[in-house]
Amino acid sequence: TAFGGDPNTHCCPVCTGMPGTLPVLNEKVLEFAVKTGLALNGTITRNCKFDRKNYFYPDLPKAYQVSQLYVPIGVNGRVSITTAAGEKDIRIHELHMEEDAGKLVHDPWLDQTRCDYNRCGVPLVEIVTEPDFRTAEEVVAYLEKLRSTLEYMGVSDCKMQEGSLRCDVNLSVRPAGSEELGTRTEMKNLNSFKAITRAIAYETRRQIECIEEGKRVIQETRRWDDNKDATFSMRSKESAQDYRYFPEPDIPPLELTEEFLQGLRAQQPEMAPERQTRYQRDYGLSEQDAKLITAQKALVDFFEAAVTCGAPAKEVCHWMLGEMMRRLKEEAIEPKQM
């Protein structure tokens, strides 16, 4: 499918769950999932399988979603982040493959909600963290690190506005000093890092006010409205038992060979930390400049191309971080759009 296509113009019988259609595993998403798991310092499951997640919602024409609950493709990863409070490791609980659902589009003028099934059946990789975040700053730092990793790996272009990088935030509050986590809500429709920061601030205030007023925080899925700067209830949040998971009968279990894994390990590119070290050593860049240049793959590609053409590395770096970034900000252009 393509971003921006007219609704329901990129569909097939498999997407819409027509009787008699059977799913087929996309080999490329398996490669991308393994590469991502390795880049996130996770353990790849050599023998994994798929499950059916059963629920009824208008954007899911089959009334079930092919996913991985019991034996996901990757587990126990780790991402190191740096904030004003210092360095911290964010634990990755699991990484699993699943198919995308459709999209509901609400028309306020007609007071109608319509279904767009263009995304149905498109494979995706979902990364689930442990509840290690304590501030919005940590969440954004993690997402920036994740975006950089996925771009370097060539797994995704990470355009949040186009949905190729999405983030659902699960949030709960608890009294200071308490070890027990509170009732969580899940927030969707978060299309930018700024929206994520604002949504976390709003939902934190809402839950605290709810508890202070003697009300109960409901476990539910909430939709972030960027224009109203608030979250709104979408539906109750089910537990795993409510989805009645069972093994997917139409996709056989996967057995990954060591040869397959070694081949993907060999394809792992030079990542941001290694490039930072090399730029400081070979080009004499400061630690801060090297960190800024390597933060996004698009900046690295531009820098490398300019230096390869004979431009002095330090001059290129200073121009990019100064004049170029200023112009991009003024014109609201992302580096990857250059």
Q: Which sequence ranges carry the predicted segments?
A:
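Composition- and surface-driven signal marking solvent-exposed, interaction-prone regions
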Residues: 185, 291, 305-306, 332-334
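Long, charged low-complexity interaction segments
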Residues: 268-293, 298-302, 306
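Residue-level detector of well-ordered alpha-helical segments, enriched
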Residues: 289, 302, 312-320
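Generic structural concept
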Residues: 294-297, 317, 321
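Small-residue-rich helix-loop
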Residues: 328-338
